Design a protein with these regions (language model features):
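Extreme N-terminal segment that seeds HTH/winged-HTH DNA-binding domains in transcriptional regulators
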Residues: 1-42
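ATP/adenylate-binding site constellation spanning eukaryotic-like Ser/Thr protein kinases
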Residues: 31, 63, 81
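Short, hydrophobic-biased segments on the C-terminal half of alpha helices
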Residues: 49-50
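All-alpha effector-binding/dimerization core of bacterial HTH-type transcriptional repressors
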Residues: 71-239
Length: 239
């Protein structure tokens, strides 16, 4: 019964949060008051709050109480190969994109990431993106994608403020079937921090990614920065 009670309390609080009973930054009632209003013990309430905190819905500060957290976009491992637009739509959010640069250039040192000679041409696309209701109005990702020019020669003529990068790739027979990704927490370079509207030394989650097609060709190399305060990543591992 205790387990069921904890689940009921958690769902009641989640419904209140999702229903707008609390705003970002609001302090929830004291544990004694909240437990009494819900008719449960403080240990049961704390168990429910701990679960809500793990989901990023609330933040508990020792000595100060429990506060409503800013919502975070959950990036699931199962959707890592979906475009960011599709991922936002799965969470019923609206995506807005700004293209910062789109140009053809020499591969240089990036050639190694795409199995190209340094003299080869690649197309570089830099964007920052917003998702409604997340990030407190700031961009939720800054990403730079590099693609071999020979695989997508008209990429620089596309409008990536509205077009889906992965859909355009697939229209040219370049479906990303699997990817190799490395995640780490970093202090982003100054130009990235500025694009994400981060304060100095505010951390970001950096994702370094190489995408492969069904033939094993490297079709994209992406460098993405997500503000740590508005992002969560779910990694599922099977044995």
């Amino acid at each position: 019964m205790a387990g069921n009670r904890y689940q009921q309390v958690m769902e009641t609080l989640r419904a209140r949060i999702e229903g707008g009973a609390y705003q970002v930054g609001d302090r929830l009632p004291a544990e004694t008051e909240l437990a009494a209003s819900l008719g449960v013990s403080r240990p049961t309430l704390r168990q429910a709050l701990a679960q809500l905190e793990s989901e990023g819905l609330v933040s508990r500060v020792k000595g100060s109480g429990t506060f409503m957290a800013a919502p975070k976009l959950l990036h699931e491992s199962t959707s890592f190969l979906a475009g960011y637009r599709q991922e936002a739509e799965r969470h019923h959010r609206t995506l807005r994109t700004q293209v910062l640069s789109l140009e053809v250039q020499r591969a240089g040192s990036l050639g190694e990431k795409l199995s190209l000679p340094s003299s080869a041409q690649i197309t570089r696309l830099a964007r920052r993106r917003w998702v409604d209701g997340l990030g407190e109005g700031r961009p939720v990702v800054y990403t730079v994608v590099h693609v071999p020019y020979a695989l997508f020669p008209d990429m620089a003529q596309q409008d990536f403020t509205t077009a889906s990068f992965y859909e355009l790739l697939e229209a040219r027979g370049l479906k990303v079937c699997h990817a190799s990704r490395v995640l780490e927490v970093v202090v982003p370079p100054p130009q990235v921090a500025k694009a994400l509207e981060l304060s100095p030394f505010e951390p970001a989650i950096y994702v370094d990614s190489v995408g492969f097609d069904a033939r094993g060709r490297r079709v994209e190399y992406a460098q993405s920065y997500y503000p740590a305060g508005s992002s969560r990543f779910l990694i599922e591992v099977e044995r």
